[in-house]
Every structure is written in C-alpha cells, then in structure tokens.
Amino acid sequence: MRHARGYRRLNRTHEHRKALFANMAGSLIEHEQIKTTLPKAKELRPIVEKLITLGKRGDLHARRQAAAQLKEDKDVAKLFDVLAERYKDRQGGYVRILKAGFRYGDMAPMAIIEFVDRDVDAKGAADKARLAEEEAAAEE
C-alpha cells in the first residue's frame, strides 16, 4: 500500500532527484518551456511554483533560498528580475503542463511544461542582450 507517499521517486536516489529537479528548474527558467516525461513535469511544477513565489518575495533571504535550489546564478537573476515582475499580480498557477504524446523509443508519456504568459522569444543566454535592446529601442 502506498499510504503517505507524497511524491514520485522516479527510480532515483534522493540526491539524484534533487540534482535532476535543480537542473530542470534552471532549464525551465532559462528557456521558459521544456519537453520532458509527464511524471517529471508533474513533480517539477510545485518546485517551480515555489521558486516563483520566492522571486515575488524578493528579499535577500528569498534570494539565498532560491540560490540554494538552483545551480546557476543567471537563473536566480532571471527569476527575481524578469519572472517575479511578470507574475507579481498572479496568485499562483504560473506553470502549465501540456501532454505531448508518447516517446518513440519506449512509449513514455511526454509533456511540455511552460510558463503561463511566457516570452516566446526566450532562448537562454541571449535573453539579457535582447531585452536590453528592446528597452533601448522603446526609450528612443
């Protein structure tokens, strides 16, 4: 019986799961949309939603808590500067999961996990330069 089993183990150790979700959360923050298996997407959603809530709090302690969960500083910066501003008026529900068929090799159910109101031009590292160019063009 699976009473009081609060999460999916995904056939991984605790440390492996922790690293997996840290990497996936960073990728989702960087690209704003990723494709993964459905169980991983369902487990990732509450992790990312809590990170967005930390970003909305915006204080130093929240930034340190987010940095402890994410691996890269650029992801923490985007979380607090871009995403927190985007979702400041939204009370939860920052992420959506769309079913995306089945993987060819093993028929694993796939899903696309993305931010609601996402930036469709988000392509990772070039984001900061692109946003700076758009702001400069808007000021002129």
UniProtKB/Swiss-Prot annotation:
PROSITE patterns: RIBOSOMAL_L17 (PS01167)
Gene3D superfamilies: Ribosomal protein L17
InterPro entries (UniProt xref): Ribosomal_bL17, Ribosomal_bL17_CS, Ribosomal_bL17_sf
Keywords in alphabetical order: Ribonucleoprotein, Ribosomal protein
Biological process according to GO: translation
Assembly with partners or alone: Part of the 50S ribosomal subunit. Contacts protein L32.
PANTHER family referenced in this protein's UniProt entry, alphabetically: LARGE RIBOSOMAL SUBUNIT PROTEIN BL17M, RIBOSOMAL PROTEIN L17
The protein's name in its UniProt record: Large ribosomal subunit protein bL17
Gene: rplQ
